[in-house]
């Protein structure tokens, strides 16, 4: 049976920032991007330091891929209804913070935003989504391409290679066992354990680096606090969802009661249909007569 490991969202802000442990992050990013990714350094950017929430949920990583291109990888993990807006904000800050005053715009680095979410974000059945920027003609329906001169100067093939790229991992949508090496990583992100027989890059090292029993006493305390906070947030989300569902039901019952009043039904009949009390229905009648 696989052993439980430290959650990735906590480890990435603590253990995996250590250069000796870069191999774990490199493995994850290499499997996700289907490329050979090497981490150059963890960026101590302004956006990593402004608030406790930013510091806890986000890390910017300067990496190098197989084409010797420098890429900023942004990994976020948080519980927010406006998470899509947060993604946009994070990418914008990464771009602006890594272009010095007076530098030409051609020095803007490619940003890949990797977002790991453990809650229901948007509507979709898949568990891995990719987003990129393309310009499509309104009349000709063609895709705008780089000119030959631009390709030679910027060493890019497509316009989308310049603009930010997004990966959204909805790990709770993943069910069953892993079918490929990327799935093996998703399985780990969801279950905090490595599936037996996994061959994905970085997972073997993750089993060693993220062993809970290897944590120092202070780190164990911090990690347990993190787990408690996650449980509290999950309970808050369930409570908010239940409250919202209750409000929807009450509003539906009131709407049905009003329709019943307009149709001439008596209070007892309306009460049986809607489960509202006679007093509530009488108040509705009074309000409608005003």
Residue ranges and their predicted role:
Residues 66, 71-76, 180-290:
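Short, charged alpha-helical interaction segments and adjacent helix-coil junctions
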């Amino acid at each position: 049976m696989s052993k439980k490991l430290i959650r990735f969202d906590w480890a990435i802000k603590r253990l995996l920032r250590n250069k000796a442990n870069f191999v774990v992050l490199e493995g994850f990013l290499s499997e996700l991007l289907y490329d050979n990714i090497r981490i150059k350094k963890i960026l101590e950017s302004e956006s990593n330091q402004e608030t406790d929430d930013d510091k806890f949920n986000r890390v910017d990583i300067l990496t190098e891929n197989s084409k010797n291109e420098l890429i900023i990888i942004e990994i976020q993990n948080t519980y927010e209804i406006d998470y899509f807006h947060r993604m946009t904000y994070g990418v914008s800050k990464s771009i602006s913070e890594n272009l010095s005053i007076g530098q030409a715009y051609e020095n803007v680095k490619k940003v890949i935003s990797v977002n790991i979410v453990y809650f229901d974000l948007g509507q979709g059945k898949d568990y891995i989504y990719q987003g990129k920027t393309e310009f499509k003609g309104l009349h000709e329906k063609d895709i705008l391409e780089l000119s030959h001169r631009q390709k030679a100067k910027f060493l890019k093939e497509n316009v989308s290679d310049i603009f930010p790229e997004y990966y959204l991992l909805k790990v709770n949508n993943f069910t069953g066992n892993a079918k490929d090496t990327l799935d093996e990583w998703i399985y780990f992100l969801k279950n905090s354990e490595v599936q037996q027989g996994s061959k994905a890059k970085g997972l073997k090292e993750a089993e060693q680096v993220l062993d809970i029993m290897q944590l120092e006493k202070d780190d164990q305390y911090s990690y347990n606090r993190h787990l408690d906070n996650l449980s509290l947030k999950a309970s808050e989300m369930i409570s908010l969802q239940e409250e919202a569902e209750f409000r929807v039901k009450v509003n539906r019952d009131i709407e049905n009661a009003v329709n019943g009043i307009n149709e001439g039904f008596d209070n007892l009949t309306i009460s049986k249909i809607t489960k509202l009390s006679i007093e509530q229905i009488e108040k509705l009648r009074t309000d409608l007569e005003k």
